[in-house]
Amino acid sequence: MTKTELRNKYKQKRKELTRIDIEEKSIAIANLVLKLDIWHHTYYHIFLSIEQQKEVDTDLLLHVLQGKDKQVVISQSNFKDYSLKHILLTDSTPVKLNKFNIPEPQDGIEVPTEKIDVVFVPLLAYDNHGNRIGYGKGFYDRFLKNCKDDVVKIGLSFFKP
């Protein structure tokens, strides 16, 4: 299958998920993440879910991270060069939907990519070798390439490879 075919297949699978499916699967994913040996790190990058894309609901993980007093980092998308700017999430960080309905920080304290210890990666599709397919713009490919060598990457998906 081509990347486009895989992308379409998994977008369709997501469309078929009900709100209850998303909630139950997101809770199961959060419970799996809680069991991982990742909680000694400081900076955790998490994506804020795009509801219309039926992504894994990261609100649960966000609450876990905040409950463990971790430094939570979210990103702002630059659609001119397909890069991400990373912002520390605080109680005063304004978050709004951009024109593509992606929740993003409007401004705040910028965090350099090399400070990030753990990245929760949105997965549309993936394989057993760590290859992923996203929405096709390469935001996360560029971001992950610039992370430090020992960054912990945790892919979040409703579906197995």
Model-assigned labels for residue ranges:
Residues 80-161:
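Conserved phosphate- and dinucleotide-binding cores of soluble alpha/beta proteins
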